[in-house]
Structure formats: structure tokens, C-alpha cells
Amino acid sequence: MARGPDTARRWATLVVLAALSTAVTTTNPGIVARITQKGLDYACQQGVLTLQKELEKITIPNFSGNFKIKYLGKGQYSFFSMVIQGFNLPNSQIRPLPDKGLDLSIRDASIKIRGKWKARKNFIKLGGNFDLSVEGISILAGLNLGYDPASGHSTVTCSSCSSGINTVRIHISGSSLGWLIQLFRKRIESLLQKSMTRKICEVVTSTVSSKLQPYFQTLPVTTKLDKVAGVDYSLVAPPRATANNLDWLLKGEFFSLAHRSPPPFAPPALAFPSDHDRMVYLGISEYFFNTAGFVYQKAGALNLTLRDDMIPKESKFRLTTKFFGILIPQVAKMFPDMQMQLFIWASLPPKLTMKPSGLDLIFVLDTQAFAILPNSSLDPLFLLEMNLNLSVVVGAKSDRLIGELRLDKLLLELKHSDIGPFSVESLQSVINYVMPTIVLPVINKKLQKGFPLPLPAYIELFNLTLQPYQDFLLFGADVHYS
């Protein structure tokens, strides 16, 4: 804490996190998501597992032709029913290419193939099984990361692909005349090389377009939080790779479900630290949190009504005119033995500031005190303004960011009185009790529900870190795909 995942899933890890990327833009993001090389390495491991399964589905065509034996003439051969038994991808790597995207490289891959063969020369028929190994396979693919400005979704395409094969070896079984294969071995090896190099890139390209891109489209760019607000996590620019990272600039902004309008302030530029030891990072600007305050305050959702039955029974403080009459005599005189009610609301949007030393919140609340008359109607007593300085403790739970407010300082001001003049200092001790013991626990209960982090599906986070910086909170984590 600070003061402050099936085929498509695994393959998607090659790029889903890679899509956490940034671009030069005139609009600062509310959130910057970053994947480090450590994260890319893990994503590559997971993605290659799925690519391996897809490559093992390659269908190999039958090969047939003629051969010639000296003094005996021509014969026919056929290689058929060939099935891939295993596709080994031992050395794989994915790296960011500055201003381009991602470079996927696989080296020293190999294939084990089993099939049948037959040969015929007049009345002589030969045949059997064969095992074939393809070794020294290399695959190079470029992945282009972009975005759809209209929807804010990230996009991915295979911009280039090439593959090569060093060696093809055939082992024949089932006939003592298997040496005949040597007559057309080179022809078979050449045909197989051409077929496999083409099909490998077809699989890579089709996997990107048929699995990755649709998967990307399922990632929500907006999240509805409640009846009042949602969060916009859309991209504000195409993904961009740098030498060591991939960044993604997200709008990172709360918005009103009833009437969306831009906040009257802009996000600051975020200066990410260069040292990273986690797979992914989220730089969450104070702008993100302040748009939350702006939306909820404008919607009139930041309010609370306090009655005496909400006060702990063991408390000496009571919301009655009798108790308040001790502090303000005219309350008891004008409204003897009555219940009271406090209506508290935010008169201004709360303002959060982030610094390396921690997170601070300025909250201005108005409190209207009422006497509850025998007919249950309300009679106004006085109106207070409360200026609160609060510390914000931020943490993470699962895929959500949670928070807690702690009171540092509270100043009272009497804005209006319906019962005549009185010293506001007489209420300071009461408000000092009400705020941390009754009001803040209600707010903190809601804050413990948290805000959803902009993460793809099936991702579990661990080794979490949270560190405040100037204008933003840096959230770091390692990733596991379930």
C-alpha cells in the first residue's frame, strides 16, 4: 500500500499486454499502461504454447511423382497420410520495435511427421511407414499495433511473416527396399520445405486475424460503475513501442451516464520512472480520481443524511436538541426534546493531489442541521461549511483499486443560522467526532468496493506495488494467466 487466460487466451498474451502502449499525442492520458520486457517474455511463453497447437493442426498435402531406375525404367511413388506428431518451439522471443510494433522471432524449431509411402514399378509394389523430421525452423513475424479512433479499441495485424527450414530428414521403415526412397528423397524434401514454410506463415497470420483481433474487440473500453458514472478506458492514440517497453495511453476518465460532458480541467503529463522490475505498470493520474469527484459531485451523489439511530448507542453524542442544547442553548429552548437530522453534501468537487510524499484530498462539505418536528417535518437550524484535509491510502484487491480516507484536519465555518448567532467553536468537538467515526466509515465502505483496473480478461495479478509520484500513482504487478 501507499499514501496513495483455450487457444485464444494464450495466443492473445503475445499482444494483449503488448497493446498496453503509448503514442505521442497532444492529449495527455488519464492512465498510462506499460508492459516491460519481462512482461513480454512471459506473454511470449504463453502465446507460443497456443501457436504450437495451431501449427500442429497443419495439414500436409500428399506428394507423388515418378522415379527412374537405371536399366529398369520409370516407376511411381507416393507419400500420403502425413500427420504432424509434434511441433517443438524451444527458442522464442518477442521484442518491441520502436515506432512500429512487435517483432516475434522463433528459432531452432522442429517438426516430427509420420506418414505412409508406396512405390510401384510394373508388377513390383513397395510401401510402408516413414518418420520425417524437419529441423532448424525459423519464424519471423511483425505485429502491427493500432487503434480505432471511433471506438477506442486497440487493433492488431500481422504486418509481415517469413519462415525458413534448414534440414529435412526421412527415415523409412516397412521394407528392405527402402533405399529406393533415396532416388526421390531430395524431391520430397524440397516439396515439403516449400509447403511447410508457406503454411507456417499462413497459420501465424490467420491466428492473429481470427483469434487475436476478435479477442481485442471483446475488451471493453468503458465500464459502468453504478447508476451515476462509468469509466472510459479507451485509447487516445495508437499503441507505440519504445526500446524497452510498450505503453498504452488511456483516456482514464469518469463520465456521467446521464449527461456526458468534459471536466473543466486537463490531465497532467506523467513522467514514468525508468527502473522497472514488474511485468506491467499502470500510471494512474490524479486526473482520473478528480474526474470521479467532479462527476459524482455534479450529479449530487456526494451526500449523506445522519439521524440519531445511526449513532452508536454507547456514544455520548446524540443527534437530539437536548444534546445540542448543551452546546447551543437556544436549540433546546426553541425545539425542546426533539430529534435532529444532519444533511451533509459536497458543495465543491473534492480535489486530490499526488506527491511522492503521499496522496492528499481537500473536501469541502456543507452540513445543514434540522430539528425533526412532531409531524416529522424539518425545521432548519443552522448551516455549516466543513473544510477537510484528508490523507488517502490506496491499495489493490484482485483487479480493483481500493481506497481509504483518513482525517488530518477539519475547519468549521458558520454559513447561516436560523436560531440566532452562536460560536461555531462550540461544535468543533462534535464534528471532530462525527466525521471520523460516522461519516468517513460510510465513505470508506464505498471506497473499499474499489474501481476496476483496465485489464484484459483472465489476468491475475501478484507481487503488487503502489508508489506515489508527482501527479500520479504508479501501480506495478507481475501477471499470471489463468
Swiss-Prot record:
The gene is BPI. GO terms for biological process: defense response to Gram-negative bacterium; innate immune response; lipopolysaccharide-mediated signaling pathway; negative regulation of interleukin-6 production; negative regulation of interleukin-8 production; negative regulation of macrophage activation; negative regulation of tumor necrosis factor production. It comes from Bos taurus (Bovine). It is found in: Secreted; Cytoplasmic granule membrane. Residues 36-219 are annotated as: N-terminal barrel. Restricted to cells of the myeloid series. Belongs to the BPI/LBP/Plunc superfamily. BPI/LBP family. This is Bactericidal permeability-increasing protein. The N-terminal region may be exposed to the interior of the granule, whereas the C-terminal portion may be embedded in the membrane. During phagocytosis and degranulation, proteases may be released and activated and cleave BPI at the junction of the N- and C-terminal portions of the molecule, providing controlled release of the N-terminal antibacterial fragment when bacteria are ingested. The keyword Disulfide bond applies.
